[in-house]
Amino acid sequence: MVTYSTFIVIAIYLILTILISWFVNQRSIGNTDFSTGGRQFGWFTAGVSILATYISAMTFIGMPGWVYQSGMEALNIHLNYPIVIFFAVVFFIPVFYRMGFTSIYEYLEHRFGVYARTINSVVFILVQCISSGVILYAIALILIQILPISIVEAIVYITLFTACYTYAGGISTVIWTDMLQSAVLIAGSVAIFVLLLLQVDGVHGVSREQLNIINLQFDLGVDTTLWAGVVAVSFLHMSVYGTNQLIIQRTLATRCEKTAQKSMLLCGYGAFFIYFFFALLGVLLSIF
């Protein structure tokens, strides 16, 4: 049931986002600030921003739903973080940071030429349009349950609002609003977790199979095995943490190379525990 408190939370969030955008815009110095934020951010702020970037509304909705259907085995695809983060921190971040680039596509032009930069930039934009479309749709599905608007209107409003505050302050606004979004996400998740615990009458409805995390099957038709997570998904996560512009751009906004590496460590190892928490929500929902 939608209450006045729901609208109050949304209003406060929108107001804080606008204030952050205005404040950052007033402090903006030059064009480089738009892409790197003046390289002023600490490891915690940048790390939380990376987490908020990678863990979107799809995670909030999708991970509990996946565990609800497949059990805790869904966590297998996230067991590769120690391997992936090691390579990202040791081999990728130092190269991008030391060369002073504002994007990974500058490195592609430097290393392979302008055609490599252009092609990869276009592909990245197309992929992000598809990915962002899915995320926007997921958020809009929630928003139309609260506000008397259609799903098309919800998508348009979210897109325009996000584009405006991003354009006003660049990466600095994005990072600080990521902090705000993370706080809202954590508060909401914890509230749901507590409410479910209060409503659930014991764990009698949970089977051993649902709680089992490690799946050692060699079945290529199952996507929640340990081998799928450690071997196959490692390459996917390597591209995400090592060469994804959305992730790397935030590390390039930090004060120094060591700070950039620490921010990636926070994101990588923090992400697993967040996914684990959402997995527990899925278990609770299965017995709710």
Name the predicted role of every residue range.
Residues W22-R27, I93, C129-L136, A140-Y157, ...:
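Hydrophobic alpha-helical segments and their helix-loop junctions in multi-pass secondary transporters
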Residues M1-F60, T166-G169, S182, G188:
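Membrane-interface "cap" regions at the ends of multi-pass membrane proteins
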